[in-house]
Amino acid sequence: MNHAVTIKSFVSTSPLSDLERGAVDKSKVAESFSAAAATYDLLAGMQKEVGESLVSLSREGCPQDIIDVGCGTGWLTHRLKNSFPEARLCAYDLSPGMIEYALAHHDNVAEIWAVADMESLPVANASQDLVFSNMAMQWLDDPRAWFAEASRVLRPGGRLICSTLLTQTLFELEQAWHGVDGGRHVNRFLSAEQVAEAAVSCGLRGECRESLYVRFHDSALDVMKELKGIGAHNIQSERPQGLTGKRRLRRVIENYEKCRQEQGVPATYHVGVCVYSRI
């Protein structure tokens, strides 16, 4: 019987690189997702849909040692365990609040639940058959550190299956803010080509597949509330400081309404699904 334990935090405090995207403050990422732990599963429909596709892709093999990196609430960790009941499964997340939630709701699913930085995992070299990660990589400044870490812990022939957000994500929201102020209100994301180049540079072989997911909402304000409810609002250092005034917010909503379709106000997610093997 698996026994889930909490071990000490393994969060890197090393300087972050920039990649001209606006540096990500990891402490704010952890804080944001900790605050969203209780509401995440109710609101993260797109993230769950992408995660289910990753679980389906993972079933092509028979891994014995698996890590779920950026495990969040543990919902997908549970899905992985259902797919591979005999596997040794460990789960890590940057957010203490998410790990606490996962322990409370999915205690015996993983052998280890731990707070850890995906760029510096407490995992032995060449020890894993499958590295799994859903919607976590986009919170890094430079994906090369993550791909290098995944390559380090994978056995030869082991697989990395992960997802990230790409350049066109939430372009409707960014356009709605354009002209209201000079700040950036949506995180900057990499292209599929940049992601693939980073993976190959770290000794991985495979591809980054692109897809568009469009979710419809009653209003632009509902889009923003959902993003906050899953902890995914803009946390890069170049974000505008201070409160968003009611007058500016009304202008954003008016701009966003120009995108309205029959189903409602769209929010587009440009998703990259990475399927790689260690050479």
Swiss-Prot record:
KW Phosphoprotein (keyword) present: no
CDD domains in the cross-refs: AdoMet_MTases (cd02440)
Gene Ontology MF terms: carboxyl-O-methyltransferase activity; malonyl-CoA methyltransferase activity; S-adenosylmethionine-dependent methyltransferase activity
InterPro entries, per database record: BioC, Malonyl-ACP_OMT, Methyltransf_11, SAM-dependent_MTases_sf
Keyword Transferase in annotation: yes
Swiss-Prot/TrEMBL GO biological process terms: biotin biosynthetic process; methylation
Signal sequence extent: none
Record's keyword terms, sorted: Biotin biosynthesis, Methyltransferase, S-adenosyl-L-methionine, Transferase
Catalysed reactions, as listed in the record: malonyl-[ACP] + S-adenosyl-L-methionine = malonyl-[ACP] methyl ester + S-adenosyl-L-homocysteine
Pathway connected to this protein: Cofactor biosynthesis; biotin biosynthesis
This enzyme's EC code(s): 2.1.1.197
Tree of life domain: Bacteria
Entry's family note: Belongs to the methyltransferase superfamily.
Function statement: Converts the free carboxyl group of a malonyl-thioester to its methyl ester by transfer of a methyl group from S-adenosyl-L-methionine (SAM). It allows to synthesize pimeloyl-ACP via the fatty acid synthetic pathway.
Record-given protein name: Malonyl-[acyl-carrier protein] O-methyltransferase
Natural source organism: Hahella chejuensis (strain KCTC 2396)
